[in-house]
Amino acid sequence: MNLNYQYAGLIPILPVFPSIFIGIGLMSFRKSFRNLRKFVGSMSIAFMFLTLILSLLFFNDQLSESYSYRFLFPWLSTKNLTLDIGYLIDPLTSIMLVLVTSVAVTVMIYSDGYMLHDQGYIRFFAYLSLFTASMLGLIVSPNLIQVYVFWELIGMCSYLLVGFWSTRPTAASACQKAFITNRVGDFGLLLGILGFYWLTGSFQFDIIQDRLNELLLTNNLNFTLFIISSVLLFLGPIAKSAQFPLHIWLPDAMEGPTPISALIHAATMVAAGIFLVARLLPIFQLSPLLMILIAFTGAITALLGACLAVAQTDLKRGLAYSTMSQLGYMMLGLGIGGYQAAIFHLITHAYSKALLFLGSGSVIHSMEPVVGYDPNKSQNIDYMGGLRKYMPITGVTFLIGTLSLCGIPPFACFWSKDEIIADAFFHLPLLGFIAWLTAGLTGFYMFRLYLLTFEGEFRAHKNLKSSSLEYPHESSFSMTLPLILLMFPTIFIGFLGLPYNLGFIQSQILSTWLVGPSIDLNSSSNWIDFFKTSATSVGIAFLGICFSFLLYSPKNASNRDFNQISNPVPKGFLSSYVKSFYNWSLNRAYIDKFYELTWIKWCGIFAQFTSYLDRWFFDGFVNGVGLLTLISGEALRYGENGKVSSYLFVILFSFILLILLGNFNSVFYF
């Protein structure tokens, strides 16, 4: 055992220290502590950088000798129940630790510039550190109970960060929507965990898998309970990773600061669901029906997300739907058993999407002094255009991220997405066709965002009377440095997933676990097979890009009316269909409206009914008894006047009344 593993427990603990320090400082020395803004930011970055170094050490150990290491100690022990806590380091854990910490470091450096003049700068870094620590804690968790604890912490931190600017009504509504939607999935996750404990008597991943295999071999497995528990548990990743039909929270989560949007979409919250399914995939594979459910959930999500991204005019919201679509790819890969391809796409997508979101934040940050601080203007691509001339670093890095997400070789996402599409065609042609069609839509909507934002002429002064005479400018060094740093993995990390033995990479974690069995680089037939597989997906992506150039090239976009810049409607018989599709896409396929008219409306009616029942029936009964007692007491109080004659009169009157009542009853009886 390498001595480094003794310190693995520090990984989720180190980022917590800045949060604790900031919390104590704000509660104890609120005014004076605000003067330590730069110190707080630097400290948070330093602790996260230490966590990254520690993660790299474990990753290096896994490269040289891939094995699992568990450290457990009892937390709660009774006669019938034992709960252990600890940490687990294996290939999946090590690669996820490096991914999360590396993206978090760049996001924190970026946040130092982006949030510099925000009054909540210190509070933001406290939330950001706790958010990252929660994700790291989930990654190293060795059992389902510990997973659930950190799962809920991630949900709480996302609520705080999405609603960071809580004075905005839209931000307050968005954080509530994200929190409540994820509660649906979390409740299913909890029931699923309890179901697996009922089946196996354990929360440990390895023990659950071994006991389920034993029960299956001996025909003692309650398959109905297993399916129900698995589906309930799968609800958690459906909500957390924004899969259909619990995807509705993700676009609204863009109301938070852009750095947290990058972290949520790249390496933390939405990645948590994919990670959990990957961790439990050996268990899910016991049921082919469940794997089909996972695969079709991912395929529907991928296609729906791509369709909804086509007509978005908000830059961040367009990227949000692209995240939803790419998460669908990952879930599809897991559903068809393509564990390696799905995890590889999680890695490549994380760096590409972090680059794109931080680039969008740079754009928004430069647009705000020009068009105002209203998100409906500063994030609207209709007011942008020609920004590459004013923001060359942001423009070039955004283009690289766009090419990667479109799956254009040799950028990162090409290697992983192409493998998922090929696996999907091999297992079920329908799934392969959906994945292939989604690749074309991805090329279309991503270059639509790029062209309308960075190419052509700047449109804000022409179409917005309230805009200033300023022009956007390149962001500060602390904001452009992370873009440059993320550009390198976006270009080169895909080469680590080449399906060939490169000679200098012989490690098991890359050649076997991550990219599959190595094949001979010198064999020309292998190259031919590889290019045959990738030609169709790259071809449809290029077709989408060409169609995007046809509609949104600077020349064509400049000749349109303002209301048709981003969503042009052709003349002729197709106009009504195209307009209907744009409206369908802009209105999120009317899924939110459907939920409002069904679940939300009827839940509101039921809540009002129960509130009325509680106030007027249950509270009315209790309050009525109290009121009757009060009135009776008040009435009897006047009888206590201290006069014996009054007491004798009451006694005599009561005695006569009882006699009369007795005689009345006897007469009625006869």
Curated annotation (Swiss-Prot):
<feature type="transmembrane region" description="Helical">
    <location>
        <begin position="85"/>
        <end position="105"/>
    </location>
</feature>
<dbReference type="GO" id="GO:0015990">
    <property type="term" value="P:electron transport coupled proton transport"/>
</dbReference>
<keyword id="KW-1278">Translocase</keyword>
<feature type="transmembrane region" description="Helical">
    <location>
        <begin position="479"/>
        <end position="499"/>
    </location>
</feature>
<comment type="subunit">
    <text>NDH is composed of at least 16 different subunits, 5 of which are encoded in the nucleus.</text>
</comment>
<keyword id="KW-0874">Quinone</keyword>
<dbReference type="GO" id="GO:0008137">
    <property type="term" value="F:NADH dehydrogenase (ubiquinone) activity"/>
</dbReference>
<feature type="transmembrane region" description="Helical">
    <location>
        <begin position="9"/>
        <end position="29"/>
    </location>
</feature>
<feature type="transmembrane region" description="Helical">
    <location>
        <begin position="534"/>
        <end position="554"/>
    </location>
</feature>
<feature type="transmembrane region" description="Helical">
    <location>
        <begin position="188"/>
        <end position="208"/>
    </location>
</feature>
<keyword id="KW-0812">Transmembrane</keyword>
<keyword id="KW-0521">NADP</keyword>
<keyword id="KW-0618">Plastoquinone</keyword>
<feature type="transmembrane region" description="Helical">
    <location>
        <begin position="120"/>
        <end position="140"/>
    </location>
</feature>
<keyword id="KW-0934">Plastid</keyword>
<keyword id="KW-0472">Membrane</keyword>
<dbReference type="InterPro" id="IPR003945">
    <property type="entry name" value="NU5C-like"/>
</dbReference>
<dbReference type="GO" id="GO:0048038">
    <property type="term" value="F:quinone binding"/>
</dbReference>
<feature type="transmembrane region" description="Helical">
    <location>
        <begin position="648"/>
        <end position="668"/>
    </location>
</feature>
<keyword id="KW-0150">Chloroplast</keyword>
<dbReference type="Pfam" id="PF00361">
    <property type="entry name" value="Proton_antipo_M"/>
</dbReference>
<keyword id="KW-0520">NAD</keyword>
<keyword id="KW-0813">Transport</keyword>
<dbReference type="GO" id="GO:0042773">
    <property type="term" value="P:ATP synthesis coupled electron transport"/>
</dbReference>
<dbReference type="GO" id="GO:0009535">
    <property type="term" value="C:chloroplast thylakoid membrane"/>
</dbReference>
<feature type="transmembrane region" description="Helical">
    <location>
        <begin position="39"/>
        <end position="59"/>
    </location>
</feature>
<keyword id="KW-0793">Thylakoid</keyword>
<feature type="transmembrane region" description="Helical">
    <location>
        <begin position="258"/>
        <end position="278"/>
    </location>
</feature>
<dbReference type="InterPro" id="IPR001750">
    <property type="entry name" value="ND/Mrp_TM"/>
</dbReference>
<comment type="function">
    <text>NDH shuttles electrons from NAD(P)H:plastoquinone, via FMN and iron-sulfur (Fe-S) centers, to quinones in the photosynthetic chain and possibly in a chloroplast respiratory chain. The immediate electron acceptor for the enzyme in this species is believed to be plastoquinone. Couples the redox reaction to proton translocation, and thus conserves the redox energy in a proton gradient.</text>
</comment>
<feature type="transmembrane region" description="Helical">
    <location>
        <begin position="327"/>
        <end position="347"/>
    </location>
</feature>
<feature type="transmembrane region" description="Helical">
    <location>
        <begin position="424"/>
        <end position="444"/>
    </location>
</feature>
<dbReference type="InterPro" id="IPR018393">
    <property type="entry name" value="NADHpl_OxRdtase_5_subgr"/>
</dbReference>
<feature type="transmembrane region" description="Helical">
    <location>
        <begin position="290"/>
        <end position="310"/>
    </location>
</feature>
<feature type="transmembrane region" description="Helical">
    <location>
        <begin position="144"/>
        <end position="164"/>
    </location>
</feature>
<protein>
    <recommendedName>
        <fullName>NAD(P)H-quinone oxidoreductase subunit 5, chloroplastic</fullName>
        <ecNumber>7.1.1.-</ecNumber>
    </recommendedName>
</protein>
<feature type="transmembrane region" description="Helical">
    <location>
        <begin position="395"/>
        <end position="415"/>
    </location>
</feature>
<comment type="similarity">
    <text>Belongs to the complex I subunit 5 family.</text>
</comment>
<dbReference type="InterPro" id="IPR001516">
    <property type="entry name" value="Proton_antipo_N"/>
</dbReference>
<feature type="transmembrane region" description="Helical">
    <location>
        <begin position="354"/>
        <end position="374"/>
    </location>
</feature>
<dbReference type="Pfam" id="PF01010">
    <property type="entry name" value="Proton_antipo_C"/>
</dbReference>
<dbReference type="InterPro" id="IPR002128">
    <property type="entry name" value="NADH_UbQ_OxRdtase_chlpt_su5_C"/>
</dbReference>
